[in-house]
A protein has these predicted regions:
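Basic, polyanion-binding surface patches
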Residues: 20-223
Length: 223
């Protein structure tokens, strides 16, 4: 049985399936904010890239991005997406990357969750979210962009490619970066020198205003 349920700005079809009744949404006809909310609600948990960039005026920009992941190790590559603002304009992070082509990704950890969230606030381009969050910086080793002094992990990166995926509000811009230097604090390592997730304590994003911890662990042997 198939019928159409109309909700504000979103045409939703409901159909029977083995998993029970379900919504069926066509992104080409649905409102962009609704598509966004559904997407971030189902693609979870999303790791957070806590990114510093440097403006031409020398202002250190800091912002979190949950459209993020690692995509290879030889060479080490990370990808994140600073989407366009709701008015279609580019965020400071993207503008800085287009000019300088360097950035640093930091681990977003539980002890720093409040600062991560605070750094998502939009401020004028001549103001630094690093100052707003009460954080310190350390000079980069291979890039001109400073890294956060408080973050236990920092990945210095150079931009390999920026791929625009649209021109409208919340359109993606895939930033492909090669990791050229890594900083990992001893305090998050185990006896073998590997990162211990129970010590690193990263946080991740869910839908809406929800976040999650990564401390509820289980292991599965690879087949």
């Amino acid at each position: 049985t198939l019928f159409c349920l109309i909700v504000p700005f979103l045409c939703v079809h409901r159909a029977a399936s083995l998993a029970g009744s379900q919504m069926q949404i066509d992104p080409s006809t649905a409102a962009v904010p609704d598509v966004y909310q559904l997407l971030v609600g189902v693609v979870t948990p999303r790791p957070i890239a806590w990114v510093t960039t440097l403006s031409p005026a020398g202002v250190v920009n800091l912002a979190p991005f949950s459209f993020f992941n690692a995509f290879g190790a030889n060479p080490p590559v990370v990808v994140f997406s600073p989407t366009l603002r709701r008015d279609g304009s580019k965020k400071d992070t993207l503008l800085n990357l287009e000019k300088l082509g360097e950035f640093v990704v930091h681990a977003a950890t539980a002890p720093l969750a409040e600062q991560v969230n605070l750094s998502s606030k939009e401020v004028p381009a001549d103001e630094s979210e690093v100052v707003l969050a009460g954080l310190g910086t350390v000079a980069g080793t291979k890039v001109r962009v400073p890294r956060l002094a408080e973050a236990p992990v920092a990945l210095e990166c150079v931009v390999k490619q920026i791929i625009p995926c649209g021109t409208g509000p919340i359109a993606a811009n895939l930033v492909v970066g090669e990791v050229v230097f890594m900083h990992v604090a001893d305090e998050v390592l185990d006896d073998r020198g590997a990162v211990d997730p129970r010590k690193l304590r990263t946080v991740a994003r869910l839908g809406g205003a929800y976040w999650c911890h990564t401390s509820d662990l289980f292991e599965l042997p690879r087949p």
